[in-house]
Amino acid sequence: MISYFNNELTTTRQISDLRFGIPIILGSNGTYEMIIAIEPLNEETFQKILEYNNSSDLKPYIAITKNRANFLKARVYDGNIARLKLPTPISFNWIKSTADPSEDFEYPLKGPYYSLREGNSNISKVAINFCKKAELLPAALIV
């Protein structure tokens, strides 16, 4: 499996894949998660992720920056990022508008947001960092 502790070439490749909307796998110590940058996410890829999620017991969530979370009035428990639970049913428009400030007027009432407190947030922090390095909105869907 690919780990974020690998060499610089692997990291550069993962950042490039995120830029093109290709999911990547990050992890360490036997815990791995699929990371999808929200900005290039399209409806087709989202539907495939939903199918995968429905066939497993995984709980996907969104990682966003502290600044975005504060604007959305979501609680921040992990330093400089917030991990948000997805609503049921999961909506493509909700995910995109939560991540993208340019859609705040199109989809004004998205809350309430429920932040994750438990679990390790290290992979989420790396995912946000990779999105920033890819020059994307710092928001990721994590499965």
Task: Give short role names for the model-derived ranges.
Residues 1-143:
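Catalytic domains of riboflavin
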